[in-house]
């Protein structure tokens, strides 16, 4: 079970070595921008490296939106991100589920997701990540994810489970792993994060493991059950300890 972290994109290989990470995740551009990622001078080096590198797509992406000024740029930047991810030999691109205007629009949001995936041209796997809050979200609650998966599950899309997000959404972690696997057939990646807030808060505020509201042993049980590569999206100070903690617990 590979354990690593979300690191600065400046030098992912050096960051991985410094943190003892066996796998990393990076942004390829500004996560709050519609601008396409710039070509990387080290693309060939990253592609040749043995280190698995995951890419997180920009936060602005909302493939479910009925608003053309949001949905169309979302499709475009996802394609551009996948193209840039292919250039570095990325293991996958992770994207949030987005949301619609009201619950009556959920089914239409599912179909917009389907259309976006059908139009996407990439050999890089794309993983849907569950989200912490937001009204009328595509991927906040596992029941909604199941409905979405009925529409997009045969496209080859994968799933990334974020423990902080599941906690914030009020979902049970270990039982939630079983529920998600029953829907998707597998979990492809885990974002193992503690939460600064109470269960069901809807707030997406990560904490280092043991410094938040989630019992560290519960996190260990969840990632063990998920049986997938692990990325800690926690604060840089303490992240090396997060990796070491998980490695000790999961290898014992």
UniProtKB/Swiss-Prot annotation:
Keywords: DNA damage, DNA repair, Endonuclease, Hydrolase, Metal-binding, Nuclease, Zinc
Known EC number: 3.1.21.2
SUPFAM superfamilies xrefs: Xylose isomerase-like
CDD domains found in the cross-reference section: AP2Ec
Comment on bound cofactor: Binds 3 Zn(2+) ions.
GO biological process: base-excision repair
List of residues binding Zn(2+) 1: 56, 96, 129
Domain of life: Bacteria
Top class in the EC scheme: hydrolase
Signal peptide location: none
Protein's UniProt keywords contain Zinc: yes
Family classification: Belongs to the AP endonuclease 2 family.
Functional description taken from the UniProt entry: Endonuclease IV plays a role in DNA repair. It cleaves phosphodiester bonds at apurinic or apyrimidinic (AP) sites, generating a 3'-hydroxyl group and a 5'-terminal sugar phosphate.
Listed name of the protein: Probable endonuclease 4
The organism of origin for this protein: Mycobacterium marinum (strain ATCC BAA-535 / M)
């Amino acid at each position: 079970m590979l354990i690593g972290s979300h690191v600065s994109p400046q030098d992912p290989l050096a960051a991985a070595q410094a943190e003892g990470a066996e796998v990393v995740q990076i942004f390829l551009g500004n996560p709050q921008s519609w601008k396409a990622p710039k070509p990387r001078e080290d693309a060939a080096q990253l592609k040749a490296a043995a280190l698995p590198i995951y890419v997180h797509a920009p936060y602005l992406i909302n493939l479910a939106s009925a608003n053309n000024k949001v949905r169309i740029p979302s499709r475009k930047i996802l394609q551009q991100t996948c193209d840039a991810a292919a250039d570095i030999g990325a293991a996958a691109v992770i994207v949030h589920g987005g949301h619609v205007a009201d619950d009556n629009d959920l089914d239409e949001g599912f179909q917009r997701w389907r259309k976006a995936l059908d139009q996407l041209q990439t050999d890089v796997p794309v993983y849907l990540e569950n989200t912490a809050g937001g009204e009328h979200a595509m991927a906040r609650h596992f029941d909604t994810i199941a409905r979405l998966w009925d529409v997009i599950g045969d496209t080859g899309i994968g799933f990334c489970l974020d423990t902080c997000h599941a906690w914030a959404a009020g979902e049970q972690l270990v039982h939630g792993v079983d529920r998600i696997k029953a829907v998707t057939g597998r979990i492809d990646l885990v974002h193992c994060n503690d939460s600064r807030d109470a269960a069901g808060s809807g707030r997406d505020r990560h904490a280092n493991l043991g410094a938040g509201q989630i019992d560290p042993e519960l996190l260990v049980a969840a990632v063990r059950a998920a049986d997938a590569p692990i990325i800690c999206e926690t604060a840089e100070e303490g992240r090396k300890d997060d990796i070491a903690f998980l490695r000790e617990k999961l290898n014992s």
